[in-house]
Design a protein with these regions (language model features):
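Active-site helix of classical SDR
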Residues: 111, 147
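Residue(s) in the substrate-gating loop at a strand-loop-helix junction
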Residues: 131
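Conserved glycine-rich cofactor-binding loop
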Residues: 14-15
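Active-site loop immediately N-terminal to the catalytic Tyr-X3-Lys motif
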Residues: 89, 136-142, 164-165
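Substrate-binding pocket helix/loop in short-chain dehydrogenase/reductase
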Residues: 87-88, 95-97
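Conserved NAD(P)H cofactor-binding loop of Rossmann-fold oxidoreductase domains
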Residues: 79-84
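Alpha-helical segment proximal to the catalytic Tyr-Lys
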Residues: 116, 160-161
């Protein structure tokens, strides 16, 4: 596919699925902005923005600045995510809350800042990376699975809310993927 001239945002772009997705869009000709808490490499083949998707105020500030600099946002990919392992009764409250803050809250924060832009331009696409853990339980992954199930529902609801504006919203649910998060 040719994405020449398309403006694409990818969260979680510092590594893993987010990085691979951002790279694929660059190779397809898109102008990509990647968001993450940190970027390990010095140079990336796309613009980078250090941003904690779980921090609503920071997301608002960064998104408002970037949206003021562009006419369109063609694609948003919500790929930021974390995995905190542990049996449910041994998982810390902080791990539970942080998993939801990033995996669900991060997408929520991006939706809040971008939905009006997608409505105004009457088009675009949003892809949200959930997980097959949303519907296939795994030992030690209760927080992750529950957060991805919530994320899937959130993304599908946003899809219904934006359908009348010609915005496509899809959810992908990959299985185990060989990334740093899984190692």
């Amino acid at each position: 596919m040719d994405f020449s001239g398309k403006n694409v945002w990818v969260t979680g772009a510092g590594k893993g699925i987010g990085y691979a997705t951002a790279l694929a869009f660059v190779e397809a000709g898109a102008k990509v902005t990647g968001f993450d808490q940190a970027f390990a490499q010095e140079q990336y083949p796309f613009a980078t923005e250090v941003m904690d998707v779980a921090d609503a105020a920071q997301v608002a500030q960064v998104c408002q600045r970037l949206l003021a600099e562009t006419e369109r946002l063609d694609v948003l990919v919500n790929a930021a995510g974390i995995l905190r392992m542990g049996a449910t009764d041994q998982l810390s409250k902080e791990d539970w809350q942080q998993t939801f803050a990033v995996n669900v809250g991060g997408a929520f924060n991006l939706f809040q800042q971008t939905m009006n832009q997608f409505r105004r331009q009457r088009g675009g696409a949003i892809v949200t990376v959930a997980s097959d853990a949303a519907h296939t339980p795994r030992i030690g992954m209760s927080a992750y699975g529950a957060s991805k199930a919530a994320l899937k529902s959130l993304a599908l609801s946003v899809g219904l809310e934006l359908a009348g504006s010609g915005v496509r919203c899809n959810v992908v649910s990959p299985g185990s993927t060989d990334t740093d998060m899984q190692r």
